[in-house]
Amino acid sequence: MKKNTSIKQTVTIAINTAIYVILSCFASIPIGPNVVLETSFSFLVFVAVLFGSKVGLSVGLLGHIIKDFFLFGNVYFNWIVCSGLLGFLFGLSKNLINLKYHSFTRKKILFFWLYQVFVNVLVFGLIAPISDVWIYAQPLKLVFLQGFLVVLSNILSYSLFGIFLMSKYSNNYGKKEVLASNNCVYYKKPPLF
């Protein structure tokens, strides 16, 4: 049983990493100097909330590495770590939001929105700019301005695309998993953790 789960998780990571890379390369909207509206981050957040922190971390790390190689020819490890951290932190909210078994209610949307503001400020407003200054000796004002623009663009992206993806998934697949047996209907209980 453990082997089957790890195979499913590996396939999930591979497929979602490919989608993340495609969105990063072809569906990013430039909004400022070195700042783009990343639809791929909205997808990463959706995947992390749906499948958990391990998948979110893996998709964030692998997807960003492949994207950097395709677009720039080299990698910026501090931003790669930030993408992985973003996926990990959003994956921690999997059991609270619980898209697989429950509706994506207004209360959950509000929680997600506040949580994404906190995570964005932490990861792209503090960790990424400080690591740019520390590793690449970038000017302090420039990196914090870029960090601020990235935080705003991510909040906009998650508010538009992330909430839309989660709402559509929840409406189509998340209400109840019904098992029919002998003309009786049983509802699968959600896992506690």
Swiss-Prot record:
It comes from Phytoplasma australiense. Keywords: Cell membrane, Membrane, Transmembrane, Transmembrane helix. Gene3D superfamilies: 1.10.1760.20. The keyword Cell membrane applies. It is a multi-pass membrane protein. PANTHER family: UPF0397 PROTEIN BC_2624-RELATED, UPF0397 PROTEIN SPR0429. This is UPF0397 protein PA0141. It is found in: Cell membrane. Belongs to the UPF0397 family. One of its GO terms (cellular component) is plasma membrane. Disulfide bonds: none annotated. The lineage of its organism: Bacteria, Bacillati, Mycoplasmatota, Mollicutes, Acholeplasmatales. HAMAP family: UPF0397 (MF_01572). The chain crosses the membrane at residues 11-31, 43-63, 69-89, 109-129, 147-167.
